[in-house]
Design a protein with these regions (language model features):
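Single conserved hydrophobic/aromatic residue that forms the stacking wall/gate
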Residues: 1-7, 11
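Thiamine diphosphate
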Residues: 9-160
């Protein structure tokens, strides 16, 4: 359950159809074979939009929803990092100590994974400004357009 001051931001995630919601197990919300995007929380729709923008450019994107950050779904991470040369973790938290930091720490303990990990989140600082969530996301580059651009750039560099 997430609650914020905006009435539209109150929701409860319930399993649909045969989805099995399990603490510590991510959910694959989109299949793809070129890049994997990992995200969490209310940013997931933006990440799905970025995946659609990449699909228009011929890049198929898998999207994983890590609805729980701890315990980390290490089994899913092993699968993802063995299949993709570019993996991006996108979150509304600091790139340090959030989901991306946990994934980076997990990756550092693995043997010889040849993958490009890209972290997209906020700077490790307080935002000393007043604004909407939309404003804050734009400030930190957490828009569908910017995410798609950064991920495409990382994918292009990896292909060289």
């Amino acid at each position: 359950l997430r609650h914020s001051s905006a009435a539209s931001d109150v929701y409860k995630r319930q399993a649909k159809n045969d989805d099995k919601f399990e603490i510590g197990r991510s959910i694959t919300v989109r299949a793809g074979s070129d890049i994997c995007l990992i995200s969490t929380g209310t940013l997931l729709p933006t990440v799905m939009e970025a995946a659609s923008k990449l699909a228009l450019q011929g890049i198929t994107v898998r999207v994983e929803s890590f609805h729980t950050i701890k315990p980390l779904d290490e089994e899913k991470l092993s699968d993802v990092f063995s299949r993709y040369s570019v993996v991006a973790v996108i979150e509304e938290l600091s790139r340090i100590s959030g989901l991306g930091g946990n994934v980076a720490e997990w990756l550092s303990r693995q043997d010889r994974m040849k993958v490009r990990l890209f972290l997209c989140g906020t700077d490790d600082e307080f935002m000393h400004e007043v604004g909407t969530q939309h404003y804050a996301r734009a400030k930190y580059g957490l828009t569908a357009e910017n995410i798609a651009h950064k991920v495409l750039d990382a994918h292009s560099k990896r292909a060289r």
